[in-house]
Regions:
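N-terminal signal peptide c-region/cleavage motif recognized by signal peptidases
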Residues: 14-17
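Long, charged/polar, soluble alpha-helical segments
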Residues: 21-140
Length: 140
């Protein structure tokens, strides 16, 4: 797969049709090729392929951090619900994260909360994308 991608990139450079890449495009390409925890350079700066929620979940597993991450996930879910793009899966994740927190399973709670927060963030992004596509679909 990596050889194919490299070959395509090389052919694009030879043909002179290389388009400028946005950060999101570069991040998504690096994440798809290398998974989380990979470092890459974009416009001279170093970044990792970790989502912000994964970074937050990597904090020390204790009650305070687990409570904060769950609260952040609930707040992000509320934003997704405001635009009517709250996924039903997320509600179950929040419930599971809360149960793990109550059981003292802080690492588990943090990991589930991070997933819930990510899904909510993607729900809001999905809303914005649908609005943009809707505007593009409406004839002038």
């Amino acid at each position: 797969m990596n050889k194919t991608i490299s070959l395509v990139a090389a052919l694009m450079m030879i043909s002179g049709s290389v388009a400028a890449q946005t950060f999101d495009e570069a991040f998504n390409a690096q994440r798809a090729m290398n998974g989380k925890g990979h470092s890459f350079t974009f416009e001279g700066k170093s970044y990792t392929t970790d989502h912000p929620e994964e970074v937050a979940a990597a904090a020390p597993a204790n009650a305070a951090n687990a409570k904060q991450l769950l609260a952040d996930a609930k707040a992000q879910y509320a934003k997704a619900l405001e635009v009517d793009f709250g996924w039903t899966l997320t509600k179950g994740l929040l419930s599971s994260a809360n149960k793990a927190l109550e059981a003292g399973e802080f690492r588990k709670s943090m990991e589930i909360s991070a997933r819930a927060q990510y899904h909510s963030r993607m729900g809001v992004a999905q809303y914005h994308q649908s609005q943009k596509e809707w505007l593009m679909a409406v004839p002038n």
